[in-house]
Amino acid sequence: MGKQQPISQRKLLGVAGLGWLFDAMDVGILSFIIAALHVEWNLSPEEMKWIGSVNSIGMAAGAFLFGLLADRIGRKKVFIITLLCFSIGSGISAFVTSLSAFLILRFVIGMGLGGELPVASTLVSEAVVPEKRGRVIVLLESFWAVGWLAAALISYFVIPSFGWQAALLLTALTAFYALYLRTSLPDSPKYESLSAKKRSMWENVKSVWARQYIRPTVMLSIVWFCVVFSYYGMFLWLPSVMLLKGFSMIQSFEYVLLMTLAQLPGYFSAAWLIEKAGRKWILVVYLIGTAGSAYFFGTADSLSLLLTAGVLLSFFNLGAWGVLYAYTPEQYPTAIRATGSGTTAAFGRIGGIFGPLLVGTLAARHISFSVIFSIFCIAILLAVACILIMGKETKQTELE
């Protein structure tokens, strides 16, 4: 078989972005399905918390294992494998009738979701010139907002009328996209030209924690943990929080859809600023905005304040995610880039395990949401401190 022709940056962004969109759509739909299962299966907050956390356990395992595999067999192959993993798993989960079976499948789906994100960002970052790399990666991450919007629309129109099973079957259709990727997507040119492909996975893991890279690895691991801990604690529970505050399921879905709309301007503003002010400082500013919004969302005592804080939370938090995905691969050379991105993202997914567990546990004990969201506020501020102390600027640096 002949070598595939190079792909334009715009087409690569669209191709990888669609994979990112499907990933976000699955995660977004899960937040609405948790709320639906709360009603249909009469789940308690203690049971609800495990759905999001098991998903994050799978994402942690997937981010680490598929990151290692991407440095061994290539970015493209792993991108396709992870896409098939979560799309087929979602389709099968539409037919389960017990929480235990649903949880097992959410672990498998989570592995695909967790593996796809760092591999896709690595693939794109290696194909873009330094002057545009940060902006393109943030724009790649903006597909996450479109996926969440699609999830909110599907949940609003499909779940109340046709059930949560129909929503999951729709996400399974993304498996067909893998067939397109197999023939249209070339692998990373930097990976293809790499002479160190025969390095063992263990050698790559050791290199990530070697003296030369331990500072960015520790910094990114802490930041990813705090950001993902807060994100999944807050966003997976948004529809359920609205339900627990007394709104109907339809009202809850409407309000979360409104909040989700703010994600796109958050991404676009970060994409515009990242090549002007740099990764480090834009990340700090957007995380501070996230912390403040989380605090006011938790303490809101009126619908208008709740929606305003929710919109700002979406704007700042998802903008920060975009910058973090641009910032992470730039810390490592090509030989260990996917391993480094996957390893630090795996620490983040561990945070994603504890976030939903924390909310479910505290909500079951009738702890106020002002206290719960204050905890997330503090976690985000810890990430800010870590970046300020240990982070370096990587704006427009040439990738090794």
From Swiss-Prot:
Q: Which Pfam families match?
A: MFS_1 (PF07690)
The protein's matches in PROSITE patterns, at most eight in alphabetical order, are given as: MFS, SUGAR_TRANSPORT_2
Q: How does it sit in the membrane?
A: Multi-pass membrane protein
**A GO molecular-function descriptor:** transmembrane transporter activity
* Free-text disruption phenotype from the record: Partially reduces sensitivity to the toxic niacin analog 6-amino-nicotinamide.
Q: Does the keyword Coiled coil apply?
A: no
Q: Which UniProt keywords apply?
A: Cell membrane, Membrane, Transmembrane, Transmembrane helix, Transport
Which residues span the membrane? 15-35, 50-70, 78-98, 99-119, 143-163, 166-186, 218-238, 254-274, 281-301, 305-325, 344-364, 371-391
Q: Which residues lie on this side of the membrane: Extracellular?
A: 36-49, 164-165, 239-253, 302-304, 365-370
Could you tell me which InterPro entries the record lists for this protein? MFS (IPR011701), MFS_dom (IPR020846), MFS_trans_sf (IPR036259), Sugar_transporter_CS (IPR005829)
Give the Cytoplasmic compartment stretches of this protein: 1-14, 71-77, 120-142, 187-217, 275-280, 326-343, 392-400
Q: Does the keyword RNA-binding apply?
A: no
- Name the principal localization, coarsely classed: membrane
Q: Where in the cell is it found?
A: Cell membrane
GO terms for CC?
plasma membrane
Family stated for the protein in its record: Belongs to the major facilitator superfamily. Sugar transporter (TC 2.A.1.1) family.
PANTHER family, alphabetized: CARBOXYLIC ACID TRANSPORTER PROTEIN HOMOLOG
Report the function annotation for this chain.
Answer: Probably involved in the uptake of amidated and deamidated forms of niacin. Increases the growth rate of E.coli that is unable to make niacin de novo; confers increased sensitivity to the toxic niacin analog 6-amino-nicotinamide to wild-type E.coli. There is probably another mechanism for niacin uptake.
- This one is known as Putative niacin/nicotinamide transporter NiaP
Which species is the source of this protein?
Answer: Bacillus subtilis (strain 168)
Q: Which gene encodes it?
A: niaP
